[in-house]
Amino acid sequence: MRRRRGERRRFIRVAEQLVVSCTPRPNEDDRFDGSTLNFSAGGILLISPTTLPIGQAVELVLRVPDDTSDLRLDGRVLRVRSLSDSHHEIAVEFTGGDTASQRALQEMLEERTELLGIEPTEPIPA
């Protein structure tokens, strides 16, 4: 991915495809599944069959392979790019979540960045 001149990311991104369930708040009946394109300690970029408005609060449930529990994180939609009627890129900034999920995400990112020889990032803001 090319960055615009002067653009800097706050967190290292890990490109990995994981299943993610997204529930818009407060519309729990509108839950849908998508998959990640990449994620970091600050947020996630996912491919979705549906679109969401910018600013929409969401609950994300990230399914991590070889892990006994899912990661539950809260966020808000920052950017949406429609690729087709049924494929949308949605960028979500993390705004919180349960402490265990935040810690588990940080550990998962540290493992993956260590394998790539990248310095780990700061923890998710509470």
Segments predicted by a language model, with ranges:
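Short beta-strand-centered aromatic/proline hotspots
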Residues: 34, 73-80
